[in-house]
Each structure stands twice: as C-alpha cells, then as structure tokens.
Amino acid sequence: IYHDRNAGRLSFNEYDALRLDGKRLIPKGSNIMTDGSIYVLEDDPFTEVVLHGTKADIWFEVKTSDGRTLRYGDTENSRQTVSPSSGSKFVNAWYISRMEDSNGNFMTYSYLHENLTLYPQTISYGKNLHTQNGADNTVNFIYENRPDKCPYIVKDVQGSMSKRLRSIETKTGDALYRHLELSYSMDPGSGASRLSRVQVWKNSDSRQ
C-alpha cells in the first residue's frame, strides 16, 4: 500500500511487485521487468538487483553492499515455473542458484521439484574462481513424504508442500563427514508434523 497506494491482488504479469527475501524491490528508472532493468531493496539502496533475460528465461543478479554477487533463477532448476490451463507458462518465483564473494569463493544450489514446490537438495562449496584447487564440499538434503500435506494454488494450478526433511548429509568428495537424522511426531491438536528428535552421526559416533 505504501508504494502502490492500493492493496490489489496479484495479476501474474510484469506489473506485480517484486520482493527479495520479503523485501520490496524498487525500480531505478522507468523500465521494469525488461532485460537490464535495475532495482534496489527498499531498505538498502546500496544493494543492486539487475534483471536479465525475457519472459520464462528471466533471472536476477544481486550485487550486495558487502561485495557478494548472488544469482536467482539463472538455471531452469532454480525457477518455480507455472503452466496455467490458459495462457503462457510463467515463472512465479526465482530461487538462489549461486553465491560468490569478492575473493572468488562460490557456492551453488540445486533443488528437488515436486507438486510445484521447490526443496533445497544440494549446496556445493569449497571452490574458487581463481584457482584450480579447492575442496569438493556438499550439503545434501534428503526428504520423505509427509502425511500432513499443505496444498496451495498459484493462479489456477494446484501445488502442495508434500515433503518434509528426513536427513542432512555433509561430505567432502565421497567421504561422509556428518549425518543428521530427523524424526517427527504428529501434533494431536492440529495433526501437523512436529519435529521430535534429531540424531547426529560423525564417523562412528552418534548422539541425540
């Protein structure tokens, strides 16, 4: 309301407001949702967001005030793409796919897609743009079906949050460093999944 002077609904077009991690993007200039459009965060004018591409291939490059460069949706895997019953498919959300610091260290992200929902699947780190050396480190997220699915609608397409996190593994190459196992109970009042236990394994040790 503060920026738009109204509380209108989503139109799923170029005039909808854009947000980065919940913060409103403010256009610099009159160009919006076109290749090369520039935005800033509403509470951080020193973080610049540049739009690249067109239509279903749009992605965003974020340059932060502390020297990091982040990419959102520059891979097909990191986009929530919706195919409505009428009209063209469109991207509803762009997820982080890469982060690089000012020294060239970088991380990449990949996602599991199911029922319109994206779940973080692998985070890879330990490499540097300026050297050929570096560790091949990964954090892997493993999911299971949840009995308390959470349905939702994007335009006329139904999605569902149907997975919950079962375990997390951290590795260097093929060597397992740590494994976390999550257990759940069901809330007797709401019927919702409730985290009840986390077990951690490192080498042959375990603890609760």
What is each stretch, according to the model?
Residues I1-Q208:
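Conserved catalytic cores of ATP-dependent inositol ring kinases
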